[in-house]
A protein has these predicted regions:
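A contiguous, mid-protein "functional segment" used to position or interact
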Residues: 69-93
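Short, intrinsically disordered, charge-biased short linear motifs at domain edges
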Residues: 16-24, 56-63
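Structured catalytic/translocation cores of nucleotide/phosphate-coupled proteins
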Residues: 9-12, 48, 52-53, 64, ...
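Generic macromolecular interface patches on structured domains
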Residues: 35, 43, 79-83, 101
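Short cysteine-rich loop/turn motifs with clustered Cys
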Residues: 17-50, 73
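A boundary/linker detector
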Residues: 1-20, 38-40, 92-113
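Histidine-centered nuclease catalytic patch
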Residues: 40-71, 84
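Basic side chains
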Residues: 5, 28, 80-83, 103
């Protein structure tokens, strides 16, 4: 991996926020994923996958304000994607439903080996 790509990988939890702002979000949310509850304080691996999620996606005009940002683990952030939801609760329900669907796929694939 080139040095420039490597530096982007370790650039921080969001390309749109400073590390300081991301840390404010993490502290406010107690280092827990809003969607699944993964605790980033539990171990290094959990902490490593924490990101900052734009509730109303940045790509769709969402602001970088504190009330539009939540702590999310990478899997939940990817599942939520750039969709727009009626509420944060609707987004959470969508993410948790998809995670459960994927859990069943995982279990079937592992069982088949």
């Amino acid at each position: 991996m080139s040095l420039s790509r490597l530096s982007k990988f370790f650039a921080g939890p969001s390309p749109h926020l400073s590390r300081e702002d991301a840390l404010k979000i993490f502290k406010r949310d107690r280092f827990k994923c809003y969607y699944c509850g993964l605790d980033g304080r539990h171990n290094y691996e959990n902490w490593l996958i924490l990101t900052v999620d734009h509730v109303h996606p940045h790509a769709k005009g969402g602001q970088r304000s504190m009330n539009n940002l939540v702590t999310a683990c990478q899997p939940c952030n990817l599942i939520k994607g750039k969709r727009i939801y009626k509420s944060l609760q609707e987004a959470k329900e969508y993410v948790l439903t998809k995670r459960e669907e994927w859990r069943h796929v995982f279990q079937e694939q592992v069982k088949a080996v």
